[in-house]
From Swiss-Prot:
Keywords: Cytoplasm, Nucleus. Residues 1-80, 312-339 are annotated as: Disordered. This is Restriction of telomere capping protein 4. It comes from Candida glabrata (strain ATCC 2001 / BCRC 20586 / JCM 3761 / NBRC 0622 / NRRL Y-65 / CBS 138) (Yeast). It comes from the Eukaryota. Residues 1-12, 67-80 have a biased composition (Basic and acidic residues).
Length: 339
């Protein structure tokens, strides 16, 4: 009898856990009943936590608390798209976040702007600019016509040939170059060139010296600079050797090409004008000094009108197709109507 009771006790001891838990929970587990609500919450928390956090909690080394704090900081900073590294201060992080948010907000504002409105605004601005430019161009053309009419009424006998025609007409007057180089003829342009060379501290004409020159003092008046340079090129090709061998400090300072363009070319044109206008009663050009004064008084006309007219004869037809009659043709028609 006693042996039977001992066997029953041993069987019950096997069913009861040795951890010392209370009888209620043990009996529930034995009978297959659900556990308490506290136990269910614990199971839910474990299943919802990150795997790394679970491993840290089960770490027997006791470092789970500090590592969990670092993980929480990293997760928080990941939400702000900032990765902390060792040695970075909190104020720097906050400032970086502030700048990032400002840039992001600005980009969002740009993206939300109506692009079609921007395009319309640009078209409107471009149209206004084009209209203003066209008005300015018309005003400039009108001003040029007024200047040309005044010049033609004052100097009706002065003709401005195209460059190819002019380069043929000046050939008989190239001999004046020998007279200027030898000192037989006094040249106003040579005197000005000499003064420019003496005022310079350089042995040769430098870019700075050239920028400081008043180029109007070396321009053949109403002929304009473009035609003058064409004449200068012919002079240089014909007198290249003489200019290169010259011992004159002034010619050496200017150099053969610039001396031909800005000293000799105006003098050749002076001879051309003096010869073609001497026999015309309407103009009193009896000396080179008279032509010098004419050139000085008509430099503005050459720069603003002549240099904007076709240089070659073939340019005239192209300009006529694009813009209509040139200023020369308009002036001729105006004079014809008045007569």
């Amino acid at each position: 009898m006693e042996d039977s009771i001992d066997l029953q006790r041993e069987s019950l001891n096997k069913l009861i856990p040795e951890s010392g838990s209370d009888d209620t929970s043990s009996s529930d587990e034995v009978n297959g009943l659900p556990t308490s609500s506290d136990g269910a919450d614990d199971v839910s928390l474990i299943n919802s936590e990150d795997l790394n956090s679970s491993l840290l909690k089960s770490d027997p080394g006791g470092t789970n608390k500090s590592d969990q704090t670092k993980n929480d900081e990293t997760d928080s900073n990941d939400d702000q798209r900032i990765v902390l590294s060792g040695g970075v201060e909190l104020e720097e992080v906050q400032e970086t976040v502030k700048v990032y948010n400002n840039v992001k907000q600005a980009l969002l504002e740009v993206e939300t702007t109506d692009e079609s409105q921007l395009i319309l605004d640009k078209i409107k601005r471009d149209s206004q600019y084009s209209s203003d430019t066209e008005c300015e161009s018309r005003d400039a053309d009108s001003e040029l016509e007024d200047i040309q009419l005044e010049f033609r009424s004052k100097y009706p006998q002065l003709q401005i040939p195209y460059s190819d025609e002019l380069c043929v007409k000046i050939i008989p007057y190239l001999d004046i170059v020998y007279d200027i180089l030898s000192g037989v003829v006094t040249s106003m342009y040579y005197t000005r060139a000499k003064r420019a060379a003496m005022d310079s501290k350089k042995a040769f004409l430098s870019a700075e010296d050239f920028r400081n020159l008043d180029i109007n003092l070396f321009t053949a008046g109403y002929f304009g600079l473009r035609r003058q340079l064409k004449v200068g090129n012919i002079i240089y090709e014909k007198f290249r050797d003489e200019l290169a061998r010259s011992k004159s400090p002034k010619i050496q300072w200017w150099g053969p090409i610039d001396f031909a363009n800005y000293v000799l070319a105006p003098e050749v044109l002076v001879s051309f004008v003096l010869d073609t206008c001497q026999n015309k009663r309407s103009v009193q050009l009896t000396s080179r000094q008279d032509v010098y004064e004419l050139f000085d008084n008509t430099t503005y006309y050459g720069n603003t009108v002549t240099d904007n007219e076709p240089l070659e004869s073939w340019e005239l037809s192209r300009k006529k197709r694009k813009y209509g009659p040139t200023n020369n043709q308009k002036t001729h028609k105006t004079r014809k109507k008045k007569s």
